[in-house]
Amino acid sequence: MKDKRLIFAIVVLVPALLVGLVFAFEATVGISFLIIGLALLAISSEKAVEHSIGIATALKLSPLMIGLVVVSLGTDFPEIVNSIISSALDHVDINVGDSFGSVLTQMTLVLGLFPFIGGAFRVKREEIVVMGACQVLAFIASVSMVEKGYISRMNAFFLVASWPLLMLITRNMMKNSPSLGQTSGRFSHHLLLSVLGFIGVAAGAYTVVQSVIALSAVFSVSEYFVSFFIVAFGTSLPEIVVDLTAIRRKQYEIAIGDAVGSSIIDAGFSIGIGTLFFPGKVTAPLAEKTGLYALTCSIVVVTMLALRQKHDRKTGLLFIMLYALAYLAIFALF
């Protein structure tokens, strides 16, 4: 009897225990590297953006232009690098999932937190309409392209080229906006630290991509879902940190410009830049449905801000609820 128990333990329990230990080890390593990568992204992006603002103010750009172009490029650098690396590794689902998820996060969660941190403030209807329309147009183009299940180099070129075109459309709106004045510190100092910050972002993005691939394999979960929910939140941390800091300093135009500007980049440029060099397949059903939900939320957000011309805790709560509902709405579709 004892021999049978010993044989059972050796044949069944020991292998099961070893499998469990290997699973736990791989999961722990994957999660650890994901956290390290996201932390590196957040810290590096904050420094890169801080000194990018220094460069922009030295050039006497307006607050809205700083937020819409300069800061948004800086805070969106994780998504841009993630797009290139994931596409190069033939994991376009990570690229699209991260970009679409980032649009949802920035247009709902990030914008929704503004009035809870800095109180209610006014928004200019024409500014939010023009910026919002650009974001929605770019997103419509992206969603229509991913539904085919493949992003070609021509599709990617269109998405990348649309960003400077959309920025030109908004240029006239910001001509009369006052600049922030002179910045402290030397221009070369800000330039050097910005470059170092962006290098840190690139390293963090590579770590995140590798950890997502590993975790998806360990838990048998779609790379797209992990990217849409977890990675997108992580790569949106720079927007959250920078924008909430700007809100506390009453720099509302920088915060609004960055949140919407980052969404414009994510909706087109971010997806396109990786697939421009490395075209590839994407899981069309997932991308289409998640993209349509994020697009609907974007339209609701822009419409509410344009109609009310102010952003308070009522609209903030609505936007945060839209973000929370994404988890229920999207999982209910599959």
Predicted feature descriptions by range:
Residues M1-F334:
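Hydrophobic alpha-helical segments, chiefly the membrane-spanning helices
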